Design a protein with these regions (language model features):
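Glycine-rich/acidic phosphate-handling loop/turn and adjacent ATP-lid/helix
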Residues: 534-561
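Short runs within selected transmembrane alpha-helices of multi-pass transporters and secretion channels
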Residues: 26, 67-68, 138-158, 165-176, ...
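Short alpha-helical transmembrane segments in multi-pass integral membrane proteins
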Residues: 1-19, 74-142, 186, 191-243, ...
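Small-residue-rich hydrophobic transmembrane alpha-helices
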Residues: 46-106, 149-165, 275-333, 373-393
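Helix-terminus/linker motif at the lipid-water interface of multi-pass membrane proteins
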Residues: 28-47, 116-126, 182-193, 254-281, ...
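Conserved short strand/loop->alpha-helix "switch" segment adjacent to the catalytic nucleotide/phosphoryl-transfer site
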Residues: 481-502, 556-557
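Flexible, glycine-/charge-rich segments associated with ATP-binding catalytic modules
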Residues: 449-463, 569-589
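Transmembrane helical elements of multi-pass membrane transporters/channels
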Residues: 14-33, 138, 149, 172, ...
Length: 589
């Protein structure tokens, strides 16, 4: 829907920045958590927390599926202006997740000892077993909050309150770190109590911030409403179907290091494995930009796909490509330059491990822009509900090509081949996908083929404009009247459609643009659907619900708000949606 590239860029970059901050806070919290544990509790209890990470992955598997599916279904419903449908998905997802979170919490506490053995603490090292037991006993208190945090963050962002998501992510990290410090200082001489406190601080932090996230949906302007009568098993099945690629991703993430590490050990031994460990330690910080852009792409593509806005999807891809080109290449160059310094933080300079780590990090730096592009492609596939291609892409990107590249290049070129395998595997995934997509879409526009858009996707008869002045609004309204008349719409509705645009868009330009000193844009899209004229007017000004304003005006004198009264008198249907920090009005005449 966003017709101007400036608005598309603004929305994408704003949300990318939000996701980058979230990922950075999460990565920093994990690193600081590890440093506090290792320096105060020793290597064995640090290993216990490392084994405990598997429990996070296990819980993430359950709630991650719903998080992806719920975001996709809700954004799709809001994209077409159906807030009731969005609330039905919201209610169904939240109620099921509450039940699953409760069951997971109870089962987690009942199965603490079996989980310890499953994750590798079989009791041969009593301190390791007891440390893992206490760590999970502490953090399992936060399973409900972890579920809520994982699932609600995307919805709160979609609801236009990304500042709250950023603030709660930072707060969660801060509470976690403060709790860790308190635990190691208060139970300095009791490692098991301290490790319990570290786990508990992580869990309770999720519980605390989830309360604030839930409070977002009590706002009057929130697009989501929880209603027990809206529960639908069909909606739950749809969410699970859309979110299943998350399951594939988890299994691929588990299988990939197992296979790759065997090759690394066979080719380079402990020296190569040490270099891989250093790379794993720093990778999270350098992936945040690509993951942030990809998260923003997924959010926008879900909305635009539901709106059947082919051009907006193409613009989103173009903006994402440029952003990756500028931001991720810059980060790649930074990592290349800092590789010796980073290697020196973990290993002694001059050793074989140090030399190999520098080579590995520099080759890894070359893969960052390619990885960001692959993440964006996957986000498009998930955002446009290409479920099977998304499954195949995940397996190829997360497991198949990395494992094959490492095995082949490692056998041919030794440890250097292992390092080069990072950018090579990323490039092979991109080239393979592009070749298959272009071959399958032969004869179509390149962008449509690469995005796997259906041949009949979008509206054959439509207009799209961006306006910034009242003169542009008047000129466009005349063009809309001509467009409607030339496509078989009767004269009365053609004139009414032009009047609706002139009143609504004119109101945005005359009043909305002047509410602050920021630069704004108003995007207009007109489509013909089932014999009706459908108009979407979207602006990035301050919140203004025209429907609420109309209800207020009805109680006042007949001369109050004539323009808004005129629009609602003309329209067959008019819906307002606050979406992605924008005002969207959908009018059907």
């Amino acid at each position: 829907m966003f017709r101007s590239k400036s608005m598309t860029s603004k929305i994408l970059l704003n949300y990318a920045f939000t996701f980058i901050v979230i990922n950075l806070a999460d990565s920093a919290s994990m690193v600081i958590d590890g440093l506090i544990t290792s320096r105060n509790l020793g290597a064995t209890l640090l290993a216990a927390t490392g084994l405990g990470d598997a429990s996070y992955e296990m819980v993430s598997l359950f709630c991650g599926i719903f998080a992806v599916g719920l975001q996709a279904t809700c954004s799709g419903a809001l994209g077409i202006g159906d807030s009731k449908k969005a609330s039905r998905y919201f209610t169904s997802g939240v109620l099921v997740l509450a039940a699953v979170a409760l069951v997971t919490t109870v089962m987690g506490f009942l199965c603490l000892d079996p989980l310890c053995r499953l994750f590798g603490a079989d009791g041969s090292d009593k301190l390791l077993h007891d440390g893992l037991y206490q760590y999970m006993r502490g953090w399992f208190v936060g399973i409900p909050g972890f579920f809520a945090f994982t699932v609600l963050c995307p919805l709160v962002t979609l609801d236009g309150n990304k500042r709250l998501v950023t603030a709660m992510t930072v707060l969660q990290s801060a509470l976690n770190i403060c709790g860790d410090y308190f635990s190691v200082l208060h139970w300095r001489n009791d490692g098991l109590r301290a490790i319990y406190g570290i786990g508990f601080s992580s869990g309770i932090a999720f519980d605390i911030v989830s309360v604030f996230l839930l409070a977002n949906f009590l706002r009057k302007r929130s697009a989501f409403r929880l209603s027990m009568g809206d529960f639908s098993l069909r909606a739950v099945r749809e969410m699970i179907h859309i979110g299943l690629p998350k399951l594939t991703q988890c299994f691929s993430n588990l299988a990939s290091p197992i296979v790759i590490n065997r090759t690394v050990l066979a080719v380079g031994g402990a020296c190569a494995m040490a270099a891989m460990s250093v790379k794993a330690s720093v990778a999270g910080f350098f992936f945040v930009a690509g993951n942030g852009i990809a998260g923003s792409v997924q959010l926008l593509s879900q909305v635009f796909y539901s709106e059947k806005d082919k051009k907006a999807l193409g613009e989103t891809a173009s903006v994402a490509l440029r952003t990756v080109g500028v931001l991720c290449i810059g980060i790649s160059a930074l990592l290349f330059a800092l590789s010796p310094l980073l290697a020196g933080l973990f290993l002694n300079a001059g050793t074989e491990e140090y030399r190999l780590t520098v080579t590995l990090l520099r080759c890894f730096s070359a893969s960052l822009p390619l990885n960001a592009l692959n993440s964006c492609v996957l986000s498009f596939l998930q955002g446009t509900r290409k479920i099977l291609p998304a499954h195949l892409y995940i397996v190829s990107h997360r497991f198949l090509f990395p494992a094959l590249s490492t095995a082949v290049l490692g056998r041919l070129f030794g440890t250097t081949g292992i390092a080069v395998a990072f950018p090579v595997s990323e490039l092979l995934v991109l080239l393979t996908y592009a070749a298959i997509a272009l071959s399958a879409g032969r004869g179509r526009e390149r962008t449509d083929a690469l995005l796997l858009l259906p041949e009949n996707f979008g509206y054959d008869e439509s207009l799209a404009f961006s306006v910034t002045t009242i003169d542009e609004v008047i000129g466009i309204s005349e063009g809309i009247e001509e467009f409607c008349s030339s496509h078989g719409i009767d004269k009365e509705r053609s004139v009414y459609s032009a009047l609706c645009i002139e009143e609504t868009a004119g109101n945005v330009v005359e009043h909305g643009f002047r509410m602050d000193n920021k630069k704004h844009c108003c995007d207009i899209r007109v489509m013909l659907e089932d014999g009706d004229v459908v108009m979407r007017i979207r602006d990035d000004c301050r919140y203004f619900n025209i429907k609420e304003r109309y209800e207020v005006l009805k109680s006042k004198g007949k001369t109050s708000g004539i323009g808004i009264r005129l629009v609602y008198g003309i329209a067959k249907e008019a819906n307002y949606i606050s979406l992605l920090n924008t005002n969207t009005l959908i009018i059907r005449v």
